[in-house]
Amino acid sequence: MKLEHPDRLMNRTPLSLAALETHDAFAERHIGPDAASQQAMLDTLGFASRAALIDAVIPASIRRAETLPLGPFAQPKSEAEALAALRALADKNQVFRSYIGQGYHDTHTPAVILRNVLENPAWYTAYTPYQPEISQGRLEALLNFQQMVADLTGLAISNASLLDEATAAAEAMTLLQRTGKPASNVFYVADDVLPQTLEVIRTRALPVGIEVKTGPAADAAQANAFGVLLQYPGVNGDVRDYRALTEAIHAAGGHVVVAADLLALTVLTPPGEWGADVAVGNTQRFGVPMGFGGPHAAYLAVRDEFKRQMPGRLVGVTVDAQGKPALRLALQTREQHIRREKATSNVCTAQALLAIMASMYAVYHGPHGLKTIALRVNRIAALFAAGVKQLGFAPINDTFFDTLTIDTGARTAQVHEFAKARRINLRRVSDTQVGVSFDETTTRDDLAALLAVFAQAAGGTAPSVDALDAGLAGVAALPAGLERTSAYLTHHVFNRHHSETEMLRYLRSLSDKDLALDRSMIPLGSCTMKLNATSEMLPVTWPEFGRIHPFAPAEQTVGYREMIDQLEQMLVAATGYAAVSLQPNAGSQGEYAGLLIIHAYHASRGEAHRDVCLIPASAHGTNPASAHMAGMKVVVVACDAQGNVDIADLKAKAEQHANDLAAIMITYPSTHGVFEQNVREICEIVHAHGGQVYVDGANMNAMVGLTAPGQFGGDVSHLNLHKTFCIPHGGGGPGVGPVAVGPHLAKFLPNQRSTGYTREENGIGAVSAAPYGSASILPISWMYIAMMGAKNLTAATETAILNANYIAKRLAPHYPVLYSGPGGLVAHECILDLRPIKETSGISVDDVAKRLMDYGFHAPTMSFPVPGTLMVEPTESESQEELDRFIAAMIAIREEIRAVEEGRADREDNPLRHAPHTAAVVTANEWPHAYSREQAAYPVASLGTNKYWPPVGRADNAYGDRNLFCSCVPMSDYA
């Protein structure tokens, strides 16, 4: 129900409790325009109601007939009720002390980072830093991440994060396939690599014809492989000297990838110093909770020769218009949004927020602090090894950093039983061995409890920790010659922010440089930058979600799995499909999983030869990149003058490839912001020729409650929980990309057999390192749906469409709206055509984007899907007041352009060509421009009370790519 003013309620008699209930209160806070504003916007559009507008926008043939079937979540919960319900689920989880290891470790998140990064909307509501001038803070934090990884691995350059260690290793494999030994299709994986990594590698290798071989690391040089993956230290704890082996692999024409633990590299010789070509790994133990598997920031570092083949985003240093240092995303021509099927990867969303947390962990602790943590962890492992030896157990690895594998023989079951009684998890290596991995959170009491477990199994008395410590003068746990001697983290940023005061101010200085949703709307088309409500974010930091190991026993994760099951059913209801998997940890991975599922379906019918994927010319770049990774051949389908799929061309291509047609990938509403009228026909054409229909769910925010891909012909979709379902973008991740499928595809949803998770016997292999992907952020979407309920989720969709049409209507007299449906209406976004402006004034879409920064706005999506355009998506969360502020800015900019067109302003010396204007430029003694300082900085009156200052002038992209530098900048360069 709508909230009523208390004065009106007081006039009613009797005043009932029901009249005072506020279950819809959250929806009123999530949806920006109130009833009066919505009616005013509808009046502008010429509609009497939201329902009338929606009837005109969405084809009647695909409208949902029923209300969202959300079952127990159909009615909205208040924020307090939803938090209480989720708390009840969280309390069903059991937080044991987990020594399972296998790539995941408990960690302390420094409180200053928890409160001022993870819980700070200035960081978590920002978008990917494609607009560098308003992203300098997070770009610096990501540059710190790159410097940290490069220093610790001993390699030349690192990217700014990948999704998890397993997918990073798979990306390294395909990187070396592109650049390595042309006569070989073999990738060799040492047998002590993390099991989940091997499984993801196998999943990735099969569609692209790579043969994966496994065996002892010592045999790698004889494998005739283009690449070899080594684990350092190994999953069972061994620290091996790979120097001679690496030389032998190189001599045989292969390259070496090393999956390395960054904390271990503070005391071990880094891979780059003994010949590794690529290093990959996870930064989770640098202050990021385990979270039942994620999200965490993986890394990939390479030798200099491979830098232009790297996947993922790369922060580089350039100069701005005034010649001052500025940061930007470098070498973007590698990425899928430009290179499409020829991209180095399909990765779009990465793990920026988690990379920032990990980098700040290194900044806060510094090199000395990190090494102290590492030495302490290693010391605890050494004391444990000495203790279990006294009890008659034999560690099988003489060398170790933090992990020991203990031969427990016939007493193995007892060890696990006694550990469980003390709320301790150990790794189940085999029927005769257990694994124990230590971390920075391990205390003396924890060590004593562990020793007591083994003593109980041995029928003896545990030695005291103090006695062990006093009696162990030193430990030869590392191979001779592998102790690190080189310096790392020598840059000043890692050596000055070690007090909380300094760290707090550093974090504040960075966040102040950036423009995020906490300052203004971010109207990026195809990105859905909507409210990430605080109540949705709160559960992310609960220990009952954060401190759960992804491979913990099932009885300890009951609450997690109930929440996941409920969220899957919520998404089934929203999409109209039969089943959902939450394993894919980004939209790109959901796409990839969906295409693998389609291939598995065809193979199950004896049609594995079907490998042609039809993709409209207007598609997002991840579509062709994912199809290529899935082993499919991309065939482009033309679009007509209105941006719709050209039905005649589709029919011709479907007929031409009928024997080999695997799928079509379409986006709905389409990438040009319109509900195509003939989407059912598109689906029917593809089905008639033996193909499956993949509906990209990037624009699901225009469909929830109104239509559903599973009901109008789709067979499979991915969703973006970081768009439609309120997980924040985090400056470029995390995200979740669930894959949703029809009933005939449900049996092919992904498994992760290496860790004991088998969802479907015929399911595809794992697509992420953990069974449920980025599980710890799933409560965000659960909370959003629970607090909205069926009616309000539909209202949110309707309001998103209303807001977009209001902007399109108001701006149409000033900028042509490139595409529209019947009645001149759009879906949830609109494309403004700036190409005529370029012809008449020389002002480019880039100039307009930079000028918007002076008005306090992030630019809409530039030049997608059409070069020279801006795609605007306001979402339902923005109020009419904020929409009007954006509209006023765009109209004012159009007047500035008109001044150029009419000769009242110079074609070069005008506020657009020199935007954005920094405070330093505006307040300088000299002002060389024909326009005033006031016009530069305060072009509209509202900026007088709320002004955002870009910290740098326009970044020189070409200079940055010509002079690639991706490390922290010396302080002297800022002088």
From Swiss-Prot:
Per the UniProt entry, the Enzyme Commission number(s) are 1.4.4.2
Give the cofactors, semicolon-separated: pyridoxal 5'-phosphate
Q: Which GO terms describe its biological process?
A: glycine decarboxylation via glycine cleavage system
| Enzymatic class | oxidoreductase
Question: At what positions is N6-(pyridoxal phosphate)lysine found?
Answer: 723
MF terms (GO), sorted A to Z: glycine binding; glycine dehydrogenase (decarboxylating) activity; pyridoxal phosphate binding
- Top-level lineage group: Bacteria
Q: Which GO terms describe its cellular component?
A: cytosol; glycine cleavage complex
Q: Which reaction does it catalyse?
A: N(6)-[(R)-lipoyl]-L-lysyl-[glycine-cleavage complex H protein] + glycine + H(+) = N(6)-[(R)-S(8)-aminomethyldihydrolipoyl]-L-lysyl-[glycine-cleavage complex H protein] + CO2
Q: Which UniProt keywords apply?
A: Oxidoreductase, Pyridoxal phosphate
Q: Which Pfam families match?
A: GcvP2_C, GDC-P
Family listed: Belongs to the GcvP family.
Q: Which PANTHER family match?
A: GLYCINE DEHYDROGENASE (DECARBOXYLATING), MITOCHONDRIAL (PTHR11773:SF1), GLYCINE DEHYDROGENASE, DECARBOXYLATING (PTHR11773)
The free-text function statement in the UniProt record for this protein reads: The glycine cleavage system catalyzes the degradation of glycine. The P protein binds the alpha-amino group of glycine through its pyridoxal phosphate cofactor; CO(2) is released and the remaining methylamine moiety is then transferred to the lipoamide cofactor of the H protein.
Quaternary organization: The glycine cleavage system is composed of four proteins: P, T, L and H.
Protein known as: Glycine dehydrogenase (decarboxylating)
